[in-house]
A protein has these predicted regions:
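Helix N-cap/beta->alpha junction signal
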Residues: 2-5, 57
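Short amphipathic alpha-helical face segments that pack within enzyme cores
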Residues: 5-12
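TOPRIM fold recognition
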Residues: 12-124
Length: 124
């Protein structure tokens, strides 16, 4: 992950999407806190067959992904997970938009499901 907020966003999304998959708890995660630290992560990443990168959708994120690809080439499965949140700056922005969409849907359902209030008055 490029930043800690993206990691926390991932945990939130994972909990919502697949709360009953305990094998996900056995995975390791690296938070760079800046893509400028990607070189420091190259050695520890060498211990893994599969690497999933959750970098920002910007030039720096693409460059970090390129560096990891150059280091490991075809010997590792490398996934660019930023495709999941294409159109957003990062995973945290994607999560925020998902939450806002849910709020809008819930408020729209709430408005439609409420029947109009009856006025108190004289009835024959």
């Amino acid at each position: 992950f490029e930043g800690f907020m993206d990691y926390l966003s991932f945990l939130t999304l994972r909990q919502e999407s697949c709360p009953n998959y305990p094998e996900l708890d056995g995975q390791d995660y690296i938070v760079l806190n800046s893509v400028s630290n990607v070189n420091k992560a190259l050695y520890p990443l060498g211990n893994y067959e599969r690497i999933h990168c959750f970098f920002d959708n910007d030039h720096a994120g693409l460059e970090a992904l390129r560096q990891i690809r150059m280091e490991y080439g075809r010997e590792r499965y490398l996934r660019d997970a930023s495709q999941i949140y294409r159109g957003c700056k990062d995973l945290n922005e994607y999560l925020q938009k998902q939450i806002e969409r849910k709020r809008q849907l819930q408020s729209a359902k709430g408005v439609r499901s409420q029947s109009p209030e009856k006025k108190n008055g004289f009835q024959l």
